[in-house]
């Protein structure tokens, strides 16, 4: 029987970084999709003073990276930045509900390719990146996992900054 413990562990981390539950009572999470669920429509395109990236632009970036990494590591390696297949909307006009569906589909497609790996030996197999290098499959998957977590934090910070109180939740709740 093929050894898949590494693949299964990466798949669990992938899902946790993308849609992990977090703390339900306070809507706090380090997961991308969970954080997006707590973003108001007003905050979707809003910018704090001095900022240049909205939550909308961050989500478009994350989705586009999922599409590109998937195409180069597991597909035909023919997609290009700046094309509708990779970047379906310009910043400032992306319909939030459609972006959410697109992001989920891009994530599911990438996860399905990882889940289809035959065994853990494939995690060491070099695969293409969209900048021309070959990297081990596990590196590509790890990069996408940490990419979700990184931008989830960025979204969380923007949402907090745009809101009425960006103190730590435990301080807001009187514990600090």
Predicted stretch roles:
Residues 1-36, 41-87, 128-176:
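Short, contiguous alpha-helical
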Residues 88-128, 135-147:
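Acidic/histidine-rich alpha-helical segments that form the ligand environment
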């Amino acid at each position: 029987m093929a050894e898949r413990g590494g693949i299964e562990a990466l798949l669990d981390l992938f899902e946790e970084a993308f849609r992990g539950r977090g703390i339900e009572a306070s809507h706090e999470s380090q997961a991308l999709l969970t954080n997006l669920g707590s973003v108001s429509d007003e905050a979707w395109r809003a910018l704090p003073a001095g900022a240049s990236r909205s939550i909308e632009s961050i989500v478009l970036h994350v989705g586009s990276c999922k599409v590109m990494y998937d195409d180069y590591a597991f597909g035909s390696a023919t997609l290009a930045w700046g094309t509708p297949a990779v970047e379906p909307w310009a910043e400032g006009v992306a319909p939030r509900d459609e972006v959410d569906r697109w992001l989920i589909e891009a994530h599911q497609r990438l996860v399905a390719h990882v889940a289809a790996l035959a065994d853990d030996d494939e995690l060491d197999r070099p695969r293409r990146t969209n900048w021309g290098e070959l990297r081990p499959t596990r590196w590509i998957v790890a990069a996408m996992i940490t990419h979700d977590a990184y931008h989830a934090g960025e979204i969380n910070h923007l949402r907090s900054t745009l809101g009425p109180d960006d103190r730590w939740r435990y301080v807001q709740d009187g514990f600090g």
